[in-house]
Amino acid sequence: METYGLETLGIINPSAVYRNLTPAQLTEHALRRGEGKLSNTGALVVKTGKYTGRSANDKFIVDTPAVHDEIAWGKVNRPIEKAKFEAIKSKVIAYLQNKEVFIFDGFAGADPKYTQAFRIVNELASQNLFIHQLLRRPTAGQLKDFKADYTIIAAPGFKCIPEIDGTRSEAAILVDYAAKLVVICGTQYAGEIKKSVFSVMNYVLPKMGVFPMHCSANMGRDGDTAVFFGLSGTGKTTLSADPNRLLIGDDEHGWADDSVFNFEGGCYAKCINLSPEGEPEIYNAIKFGALVENVVMDDETREFDFDDDSLAVNSRVGYPVEYIPNAELSGMSSSVPKTVIFLTADAYGVLPPISKLDKNQAMYYFVSGFTSKVAGTEIGITEPVPTFSTCFGEPFLPLDPSVYAAMLAEKVEKSDAHVYLVNTGWNGTGKRMKLSYTRAMVTAALTGAIEQSEFVTDPTFGVQVPTSIEGVPSELLIPANTWEDKAAYQASCQKLAKSFVENFKKYTHMSTEVVAAGPKAE
């Protein structure tokens, strides 16, 4: 039996080894193994059990001399001793003996100058299907000569014992940058594999002069490129899927000297309240070859109920970028971005739905990474919680935030890009901004039409706010107009402004100009 070099990991007697199977073969294996069911559209549908989102508190980085001084240790990048990592790894390897093993050998990074080769070793065929569709798939020639830079082992069926293993729970995501190895166990949420790849890219690329971004990206027919930063649930995937523009990617990109490139070859979209009217591209991508997680499906008709969140609010679908009609399949733009959009979901209801930032404000709001945690993207979040996530991607950034902030400033300055802050969250009415209005605002930013508007300065946040945009009721553009109780509006403004100021105190390395670009707290 061909083992494709698995013995180098210590997996010496698997019952079967499958490498780079087609989506059809992987779907067959998953059904045979009882991992999921087929929907009426032909998609493979699985339930991931108790873990339906990232388990952020269960992620650890192996603390070795080689990386100790590089990693920004803290509540996000928690250290674990090498010996503990080795002990868990040995148990996971032992667990995989005599089991079927599914390998996907592929790539992250569409630009060949910066590509990293990943070997993903899966216990589950369904997870192997997911990563096959999410990463960049090799040609036959590339597969023949394949040599992995990094390896990820995903064994959801192996449960850690915290008292013995030194973990927080039965689940663990363990990253050893020195050994170029990631071990994921105890959780079946496929997003953990994808985000482990992202964490690796965020470690590797800055050393190559590339700015890694938690963003979506698209480009106009004439090549003008835009990037959309934002945390889960703020609209990256939705807003970058634009029928008038080519989608480069929906979540993870690198900004090089001459282009933006996708790390991935697929998309991982939220399914809650999905409709053919609201998001036709995503809705139509749920077909054969796609992996659907935690969407309620009728057992008889095999039809989805996207509005039912009883399995998870964070229901998801993974599919290859080819399933989006206007995808840029090369995964690369032909130029650097001219428009940079920071997406935020403000639960206070006081940030303007769109505003323009100067250079210092761009640095301030990027580093702050303000949003409200939206239900479902992490275990235990059910109501919006205001939060700050450094550089809109703190859970995935192993290096000091100043590294990424400096890279943004340098790239924006070089490309002369316009930077906008877009609030996809709530306003004074207590309702969330309509998607159609947000789309109209984003379109105005991309086409430059927004520049024809008159701008006023927001008294608290100092940003420039347009007073009119085609297709958007003018009263919604100025947050104060949506509040009946002006005193309550002022109180909310101050509450949020103070949160910003308090949060920014930890960034002691920032210039006085950048600090002064923040909100005015009284």
Language model regions located:
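Charged, amphipathic alpha-helical linker segments immediately N-terminal to NTP-binding catalytic cores
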Residues: A148-Y150, A154-V204
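Conserved lysine of the Walker
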Residues: K236
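Glycine-rich, often acidic-flanked micro-motifs
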Residues: E2-G42, K50-Y51, P206, H214-L231, ...
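Gly-rich Lys/Arg/Thr-decorated short loops/hinges at beta-loop-alpha junctions or inter-strand turns
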Residues: H68-W73, D176-C185, V385-C391
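Hydrophobic positions on the alpha1 helix immediately C-terminal to the Walker A/P-loop
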Residues: L239
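N-terminal accessory targeting/assembly segments
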Residues: M1-K144
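Generic C-terminus detector
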Residues: L476, N481-E522
